[in-house]
Amino acid sequence: MGSTNKLKFISLILMLIINYQFSNSQIYEFGGIFGGTNFIGDVGDTKFINPNESAFGGIVKWNRSPRHAYRISFISSNLTANDLDSNDPRRNERGYNFSSNIKEISTGMEFNFFDYNLHEYDVTFTPYIYSGIIYSKYENLFFNGNNLENSNEYDWSFGIPIVLGLKYRIFEKFILSFEIGARYTFSDKIDGSIPYNENFNFTFGNENNNDWYMFSGLNLTYTFGRQPCYCNIK
């Protein structure tokens, strides 16, 4: 099964799960994601919060209780990095750079630090954390000597999101969230440091450290659904 078919299959499974939850639950949110991304790996700067590319996407949540919600999201962005932006003189001298389009599907659980019942309008904000699993699809890149090559194919990797956020009710039905999240991927190939093709054996960087990328931005969601009864939730 090709990477495109894998992405379609996983998207279908996740949407079936969401549809099932919608038919059996009470409080939902859906909306848009807007922000920026930056890469942390074997090329470029290593600052954790340094967005240099715009990102956008969508998000759906099922609020299972005032303290936790299940969610699924999609983000599209580019990951770019340039050794000349690094504080490491060895990277400055090397001078590598890359740019790769990336698409991410994420699903997992969001935990609120405070009780956050969407039908109690005096409850206006809460910090939260989110984690789960991500599926990232990115371009296959490799370096042929000092030249970056694009295979015009895509690869994919699973990963783990580690997200800290703050949500705030701005209107009766609208929630604005700000979050900063790291994505630890199970791949070290996003920046082209490990070629996907065995015919190109030029590698560089630390092969024991996988690639990371960050998302910093806003979620704006609309809430709907009848008032829930949380009395049976344990």
Language-model segments: which ranges?
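Gram-negative (and chloroplast) outer-membrane scaffold detector with strong preference
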Residues: 68, 72-143, 222-224
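Residues that define the transmembrane beta-barrel architecture of outer-membrane proteins
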Residues: 26, 50-54, 101-105, 125, ...
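Residues on the lipid-exposed face of transmembrane beta-strands in outer-membrane beta-barrel proteins
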Residues: 32, 36, 58-62, 107-111, ...
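Short glycine/proline- and aromatic-enriched beta-strand/turn motifs that initiate or cap beta-hairpins
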Residues: 23-63, 140, 217-228
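Outer-membrane beta-barrel translocator domains and adjoining extracellular loop/strand segments
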Residues: 42-47, 83-89, 120-123, 140-147, ...
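Short loop/turn motifs that connect adjacent beta-strands in outer-membrane beta-barrel proteins
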Residues: 23-27, 66-67, 115-125, 170-173, ...
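Predominantly the C-terminal beta-signal and adjacent terminal strand-loop region
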Residues: 81-84, 170-234
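Extracellular loop and loop/strand-boundary signature of outer-membrane beta-barrel proteins
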Residues: 40-47, 90-98, 147-152, 203-206
